[in-house]
């Protein structure tokens, strides 16, 4: 293991605590603003509590990016310890968080490398975990960057949400489209393209949208759909997680399934009831 490389990510990546502890990864949190109070994402409020509030109250959550000061503090700490820093960021197109890190890097002497996953939530977290595995194997930063670039060309990630309300609030869809969609019980199928959330399809009802999402993924994969690993992202709907697990086992026959909980800052823009799958093209 290359003990001199310190991996840092932001809370947009939704890396679970087991991975953070296993690979000694530091997280720079974004800020969630809920009912007039500020919370550090993943520190001051857990996803389970957050989604409960969303379902039970008429809450209007907002988020703010991680700041220059946050990155300067953590970069200072580890460069003074003689560490080489590898910061793996959530999509720079979706938030100014990565730019905050770039500005902090300019003002600090030391070896700091920044990799933009161009993705969000478990799509970004997956890159963090893969990088950590490679660093543990003794790979160099250059080798890690090359491997991550190759992964970018091969992965397929799609997800769906329970309600269109939060996408409307975030300006992802129009008020008219949200109103019609809610009336007809239309659920969107989404992906992260060029760092931003975009719609790839839709279906009526929860059951239909999951099946449609799987069909869209299979189309992307082509003939060879069996997988060594499948990554499942979910928010607060454990039944949906189990349903996705059953379907993933049946369709993709993976040797391993890993789970990521969609955190509060992503959840503020997606709402509760998120479910998604990440797989790979051969």
Regions found by a protein language model. Name each.
Residues 5-65:
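N-terminal glycine-rich anion-binding loop in soluble enzyme alpha/beta folds
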């Amino acid at each position: 293991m290359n003990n001199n490389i310190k991996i840092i990510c932001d809370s947009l990546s939704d890396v679970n605590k087991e991975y953070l502890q296993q690979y000694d990864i530091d997280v720079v949190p974004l800020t969630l603003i809920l009912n007039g109070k500020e919370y550090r994402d993943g520190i001051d409020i857990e996803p389970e509590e957050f989604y409960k509030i969303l379902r039970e109250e008429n809450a209007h959550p907002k988020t703010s990016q991680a700041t220059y000061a946050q990155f300067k503090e953590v970069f200072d700490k580890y460069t003074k310890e003689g560490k080489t820093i590898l910061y793996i960021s959530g999509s720079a197109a979706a938030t100014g968080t990565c730019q905050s890190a770039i500005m902090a890097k300019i003002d600090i002497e030391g070896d700091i490398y920044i990799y933009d996953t161009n993705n969000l939530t478990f799509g970004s977290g997956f890159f963090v975990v893969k990088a950590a595995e490679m660093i543990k194997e003794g790979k160099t930063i250059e080798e890690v960057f090359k491997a991550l670039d190759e992964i970018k060309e091969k992965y397929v990630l799609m997800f769906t949400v329970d309600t269109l309300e939060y996408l409307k609030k975030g300006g992802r869809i129009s008020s008219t489209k949200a109103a019609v969609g809610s009336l007809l019980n239309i659920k969107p199928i989404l992906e992260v393209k060029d760092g931003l959330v975009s719609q790839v399809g839709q279906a009526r009802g929860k059951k239909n949208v999951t099946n449609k999402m799987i069909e869209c993924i299979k189309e992307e994969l082509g003939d060879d759909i069996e997988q060594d690993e499948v990554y499942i992202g979910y928010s607060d709907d454990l039944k949906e997680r189990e349903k996705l697990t059953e379907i993933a086992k049946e369709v993709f026959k993976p040797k391993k399934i890993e789970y990521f909980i969609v955190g509060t800052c992503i959840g503020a823009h997606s709402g509760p009831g998120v479910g998604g799958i990440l797989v790979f093209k051969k």
